[in-house]
Amino acid sequence: MATVLTTAIDVCFNPQNSDTKKHSLFLKPSLFRQSRSRKLNISCSSLKQPKTLEEEPITTKTPSLSEQLKPLSATTLRQEQTQILSKPKSVWVNPTRPKRSVLSLQRQKRSAYSYNPQIKDLRAFALKLNSSIFTEKSEFLSLLDEIPHPPNRDNALLVLNSLREWQKTHTFFNWVKSKSLFPMETIFYNVTMKSLRFGRQFQLIEEMALEMVKDGVELDNITYSTIITCAKRCNLYNKAIEWFERMYKTGLMPDEVTYSAILDVYSKSGKVEEVLSLYERAVATGWKPDAIAFSVLGKMFGEAGDYDGIRYVLQEMKSMDVKPNVVVYNTLLEAMGRAGKPGLARSLFNEMLEAGLTPNEKTLTALVKIYGKARWARDALQLWEEMKAKKWPMDFILYNTLLNMCADIGLEEEAERLFNDMKESVQCRPDNFSYTAMLNIYGSGGKAEKAMELFEEMLKAGVQVNVMGCTCLVQCLGKAKRIDDVVYVFDLSIKRGVKPDDRLCGCLLSVMALCESSEDAEKVMACLERANKKLVTFVNLIVDEKTEYETVKEEFKLVINATQVEARRPFCNCLIDICRGNNRHERAHELLYLGTLFGLYPGLHNKTIKEWSLDVRSLSVGAAETALEEWMRTLANIIKRQEELPELFLAQTGTGTHRFSQGLANSFALHLQQLSAPFRQSDRPGIFVATKEDLVSWLESKFPPLVTSQA
């Protein structure tokens, strides 16, 4: 006979104050206000006979709570455990701030197409629609009536998916909808929207989406992804973000395709913090980003030049065991270039080769740009030889990038070999950018004869002359004092449709400053007048001795404001050179002062406790000589006022990154020699040094009143 055991247990619950908030998620607050002491009755039944008092040992020890509950656990707890099929992933979630998932880990499944027996006829009809050219919409609509089979759901969907031009797709969609033969499902809208996306027709896509909302048609992940990516292609980032937020409001979770697209949108909008927040929240919910998502992150950090961010992307990919593809490597290489890390870019490229991937044209172009920017000529040429040996793909952009790198560094022989390779190539014949790069190389090396021969060859080949090529050739001929050829090239370029820009005008100004006769100067002035009449008026103004300073100041302001920012300093340099060539030295000093006043020469003067320096690296020869003279005047006045001077004075001309860029340093050294200035060539090239004692002594000899002021 079963025996019933009944016992009473006192249970006391004392919650900690710090845990109140945590327990309030599960218990009502009223439970904590009730009595904390409860009596619970527990009944247990057993088939065994109860022991008598004589059999029960006498003990004074009070049984613990676990001992009292042991009979209950023996009858209510199951001995066998539920088998777990797979090991669950452990994800830590902060209990005080729980976050819901931000995306669905399952991609939107595409609708399966059922077999259509009329597929052959319908595809032939779609091919006819694609090949036909229509000037009027009515012509296309009349042709739709010739559809070989009734436009039911499957037939209409097959034709809609086979059309290529977005105008025809949109018209066919509206035609089917007007028939009202069947309800328009989401897939019809998605197919039409994708076609409109190719045509960058965001307004039509948005109208269709709003129409879906109005008619109660469901918008799925494919719909939202198409809307967002189309807005991104049209640079309508605010619209993309608006539809992404609207997606969340409807309760639909984006899949990884939509999520990667919105990451790219936030990235292009410059919202780095939002991108990282979305990325980290998605990873915390179990998302494993693919190569596309990492490419977005790498591009974002690369455009900002954030090397630490690029390292973060590489570490994340490694920790998640995501192998980058060629697109990701291209993005990261471009990012390394913007961050100024050529060594790391080379290591990344070698890692790509070791992974068994073959670089494409974009990969090689990005690497050549990095090497060219860093002046790594040897590495760039080795890469070129490796390209030819392994027969890697090369296109126009890659060839021209290599040529431009040779032009920047001054590698004439290598550029000629590369240019000849392009001539022998079937697919990559030289274009106007290729010829421009070669003209730049010959111009920088002073090879006027070769430059003219190349120009004539360019005309015979029927290659269009561009303004940059004209500028390079005019500069080369001007340095060679071949003024008649300058006029010939300029006239021919204008006839060929070249529109002069500020760079070409600045080049004509520099040629005018080099003219040794008034006749040559007038020829160049005639060319400049066809390009910029206001500039010619200002040149006549500054060489006139009767022009007052205030007039020069006002006209200078108008000319500079009408000039592109990158051409303003070259303009001022050339104008100073023209004044010095016409023995208008005081006017040259006025123009230098105005240029400094309007911010054209930042960093011209630098001062520390130990040394003062004059940086003329961005100045022309005449402007550098004028700046030196002005600096000496200022130092003479400082000595006159008996102010403190440093122990060392420096003048920096630089050596230039180009092999032929030694003109400024040589001309500046010659000018110092003519002045008998105490500056001497330093061990570092392009730097001239003078001590305080030598400079003060020289200034006192040049300005005798200083001797009495120092006595």
From Swiss-Prot:
It comes from the Eukaryota. PPR repeats lie at residues 185-219, 220-254, 255-289, 290-324, 325-359, 360-394, 395-425, 431-465, 466-500, 501-535. Gene3D superfamilies: Tetratricopeptide repeat domain. One of its GO terms (molecular function) is rRNA endonuclease activity. Keywords: Chloroplast, Plastid, Repeat, Transit peptide. GO terms for biological process: chloroplast rRNA processing; ribosome biogenesis. It is found in: Plastid, Chloroplast. InterPro entries: Pentatricopeptide_rpt, Smr_dom, TPR-like_helical_dom_sf. Belongs to the PPR family. P subfamily. Residues 1-43 form a transit peptide. One of its GO terms (cellular component) is chloroplast. Residues 614-696 form the Smr domain. The keyword Transit peptide applies. This is Pentatricopeptide repeat-containing protein At5g46580, chloroplastic.
